């Protein structure tokens, strides 16, 4: 037999930890969906700003944007 049950060692349920107690409120909304679009527009704006930020960093790295007074060695 592959599994074996030991007498008197029944599991009483999940263990409670301090970390679990602290994170419990973050999981209390699990399965609930905000009506309508929710925060989708905010996420779209955040993604657009992040893409602009990355393109600025790339342009600086490629020296396609010249910065006055800063020497690139």
UniProtKB/Swiss-Prot annotation:
SUPFAM superfamilies: Photosystem II 10 kDa phosphoprotein PsbH. Residues 1-20 are annotated as: Disordered. Signal peptide: none annotated. The modification Phosphothreonine is found at residues 3, 5. It is found in: Plastid, Chloroplast thylakoid membrane. It holds the Pfam family PsbH. GO terms for cellular component: chloroplast thylakoid membrane; photosystem II. The chain crosses the membrane at residues 41-61. Phosphorylation is a light-dependent reaction catalyzed by a membrane-bound kinase; phosphorylation occurs on Thr residue(s) in the N-terminus of the protein. One of the components of the core complex of photosystem II (PSII), required for its stability and/or assembly. PSII is a light-driven water:plastoquinone oxidoreductase that uses light energy to abstract electrons from H(2)O, generating O(2) and a proton gradient subsequently used for ATP formation. It consists of a core antenna complex that captures photons, and an electron transfer chain that converts photonic excitation into a charge separation. PSII is composed of 1 copy each of membrane proteins PsbA, PsbB, PsbC, PsbD, PsbE, PsbF, PsbH, PsbI, PsbJ, PsbK, PsbL, PsbM, PsbT, PsbX, PsbY, PsbZ, Psb30/Ycf12, at least 3 peripheral proteins of the oxygen-evolving complex and a large number of cofactors. It forms dimeric complexes. Belongs to the PsbH family. This is Photosystem II reaction center protein H. It comes from Liriodendron tulipifera. The gene is psbH.
């Amino acid at each position: 037999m592959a599994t074996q049950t030991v007498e008197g060692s029944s599991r009483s349920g999940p263990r409670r930890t301090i970390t679990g107690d602290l994170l419990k409120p973050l999981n209390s909304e699990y399965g609930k969906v905000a009506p309508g679009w929710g925060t989708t527009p905010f996420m779209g704006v955040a993604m657009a700003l992040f893409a602009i930020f990355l393109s600025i960093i790339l342009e600086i790295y490629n020296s396609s944007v010249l910065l006055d007074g800063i020497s690139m060695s």
